Structures are given as structure tokens and as C-alpha cells.
């Protein structure tokens, strides 16, 4: 438990450094400009390198299907629960779309990866990447966009083919890594060292970027009726669903604990992009990210103790 608290304290300090950048704007670089650069570097270079490094070595098999099923079903059931709640309280469309995205899609990589890696070790990189690339990301780029379009402004241009969303560096890296893995091709010694060094840059850049995305200016009293159920579903109901599913899927030990905790992470940052593009309530979503991230500093240690 002490290790968990120490890890979260370290993550919090690094996030606060990112949040401090928003206030100080060194060299007149705004937080949004800096975050765009950092997240682009991670997405187009460091993340694919880490995906290649991890999945090339990973034990891909039945457990990969377990992770995929656990992540996918947990997200789908959370979407259903949030939709029912939005219907019950008669949320308007822009708020409904934002709340569904915030409650159902966890920050499995940008926060989950560094937290789980620090607590359980490097082996969790494989777990996080498989939940992200084989469960959450496909749902974000398909069902997530469909929901955003449905609840957002009308008149949006026809979306690209679903396959076009997967024409991205992390997915290509995953494809190459899985092919190399299944063909049992060894990683050259010189390349292994390079991949590991580059992979080490991902976690601190992710945490700092997350801090850049947080803004207390987005906190609005009028949004509290939407934020309370969002946080309840994201930080408590979804992990309960994941815990129940993990038992059905025969996941045990540390893999079960790490997988459930990954799905207990706060709202993903990327959802703000979908809210902006499809005219959902972006302010509400930004507040959900800030509040659930802050509350996760309490909920994650509790889940760690329970699991």
C-alpha cells in the first residue's frame, strides 16, 4: 500500500508540474501548444516504439483474448449504464454525449501505464497496451465516434471509413510486433536496447501532458449534476463490472488486479477532441477529466486495497 501511495504522489507532482506550465507559460508557450507537441511526439514516435518493444516480447495467446474481452465488455456495459442514467435524468444531447464518453472510456494508457508500471513492474506494459489497442481504441474510433456524432451537432461531414482510423502508427507497430512475435523472430541485441531506452520516455511525457490538460478554470457549479454520476460510474461502477468479468474470464492474481485497476483509471483525455469536433459539451468533459483525475488519487488506493 505504501508503494501505491508513493507512486501516486510521484505522479501527482509530475502532473502538477504540467499544470504549473499552464499558469507560467514559459517562453510564451501555452499549455495547449506544449501538450499538442508532446502528445504528437509520443503518439507518432515513442508510443509505436514502445508497442513494438512490448508486443514483440509479449506472450500473445489466450490471455490477450481475456484482456480484450475484459476491456471491451466493461466499456460497453458502462456505456449502457451511462445512457440509461442520462435518459432517466433527461440530459440534453450535448451533455449526454460528453457524459457517456467521460464515464465509459478510461485513461488506460496515459495514466494507467505509468501507474501500473511503477506498482507492478514492466510486465504491465503488455497488459496496458493490449487493453488499449485490442479493446478501448477500436471502440473509441468506432462506437465512440458514432455516439459523438449522434449526440453532437448535425451537418457533420460523412466520416472516413472505419479502417482509416486504424491507419495510425501505434496500430501499425502492433501489427508488425505481433507478426514478429508469432514468427518467433528474436530481437537483435542492439535494437532491444534502443527500444527500451525510447520506451522509458513514454511514461513521464504522458503524465506531464496529462497535467497540461488539466484546468481548474473548467470547474463549473452548473456541471456538478452531470459530474457526480460520471465520476460514480467511471471510478466505482466500471471497476466493479471489470472485477465481475475478470472472475468470469478466470483472470487471477496480479494480472487480474492490474487489469481491473487499469479500467478504474479516470476519464481519457482524448475525448475532449471528439467533444470539440462534434459540438458536445467540451467544458463539461474537461471538468470530468479534471475531477475524475483528482478523485482517482483516492479511489485507486482503495481499489488496490480491495483487490
Describe each region flagged by the PLM:
Residues 1-307:
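Alpha-helical transmembrane segments of multi-pass small-molecule/ion transporters
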